[in-house]
Curated annotation (Swiss-Prot):
Alphabetized CDD domains for the sequence: CDP-ME_synthetase
Metabolic or biological pathway: Isoprenoid biosynthesis; isopentenyl diphosphate biosynthesis via DXP pathway; isopentenyl diphosphate from 1-deoxy-D-xylulose 5-phosphate: step 2/6
Family, per entry: Belongs to the IspD/TarI cytidylyltransferase family. IspD subfamily.
Protein name: 2-C-methyl-D-erythritol 4-phosphate cytidylyltransferase
Catalytic activity of the protein: 2-C-methyl-D-erythritol 4-phosphate + CTP + H(+) = 4-CDP-2-C-methyl-D-erythritol + diphosphate
Presence of keyword Zinc: no
EC code(s) of this entry: 2.7.7.60
Gene this chain is encoded by: ispD
UniProt KW keywords: Isoprene biosynthesis, Nucleotidyltransferase, Transferase
Lineage of the organism: Bacteria, Pseudomonadati, Pseudomonadota, Alphaproteobacteria, Rhodobacterales
Marked site (Positions MEP for the nucleophilic attack) residue numbers: R152, K205
Main function: Catalyzes the formation of 4-diphosphocytidyl-2-C-methyl-D-erythritol from CTP and 2-C-methyl-D-erythritol 4-phosphate (MEP).
Length: 225
């Protein structure tokens, strides 16, 4: 089956600190996005890779490995995350794509096995996404004080890549009014079932300064350093 990967990297997040959005900050000597793209370019069965960028980042994006050679296609993002994903989905229309992976550009440590088992879950459902069960105690707070606890039974921390049958998620995005937190929300609004796939604690989203140090340690371990 023909599969495309959409890497969403049009955000301007600043919680990581620094002068650049987190996906463009250096990680082990390369931009975060370079690691993310390498994972999908190496993934079995992915025939096209689309990188969704902010218009201001085009020069940076053109310098990434794979872009100049045409192995990574650039798509300009929209005013929101779901609009950015929709732009990429529309760019694939009519290309014979059957499955699509949608991934946060700021998750550079996605493993080949996670990509493979997420795609495999599409055999039994129109959507699939990795997640990790919540294991910590959960509190409700107000005014800086704990005011209650929350049962964590059945709660998961969502990850990406989120995989879908292409035509189903394209139709779901076209029908959605916008404002979704992720593509699972868009899919469920359209009545699509989404299978939960076993996620990975190391598949972190670099969001805060400390995340970069952790990601560098994990990369060093993976390289045997």
């Amino acid at each position: 089956m023909t599969t495309a990967a959409i890497i969403v990297a049009a955000g301007r997040g600043t919680r990581a600190g620094g002068d650049l959005p987190k996906q463009w900050q250096p990680l082990a000597g390369r931009p975060v996005l370079a690691h993310t793209l390498a994972a999908f370019r190496a993934a079995a069965g992915v025939s096209r890779t689309l990188l969704v960028i902010h218009p201001d980042d085009r020069a940076r994006a053109e310098a990434l490995p794979g872009v100049a050679e045409g192995k990574v296609e650039l798509v300009e993002g929209g005013a929101s995350r779901d609009a950015s994903v929709r732009n990429a989905l529309e760019a694939l229309a009519g290309a014979g794509i059957e499955r699509v992976l949608i991934h946060d550009g700021a998750r550079p440590l996605v493993a080949p096995g996670l990509i493979a088992r997420t795609l495999a879950a599409l055999e039994s459902a129109p959507g699939a996404a990795p997640a990790v069960p919540v294991s910590d105690a959960l509190w409700r707070g107000e005014g800086g004080r704990v005011v209650g606890t929350q049962d964590r039974t059945g709660l998961f921390r969502a990850q990406t890549p989120q995989a879908f049958r292409y035509e189903a998620i394209l139709a779901a995005h076209r029908a959605h009014p916008g404002g979704a937190a992720d593509d699972v929300e868009v899919a469920r609004a359209a009545g699509l079932e989404v299978a939960i796939v076993e996620g990975c604690e190391d598949n972190l989203k670099v969001t805060y300064p400390g995340d970069f140090a952790r990601a560098e340690r994990l990369l060093a371990l993976a390289a045997g350093l």
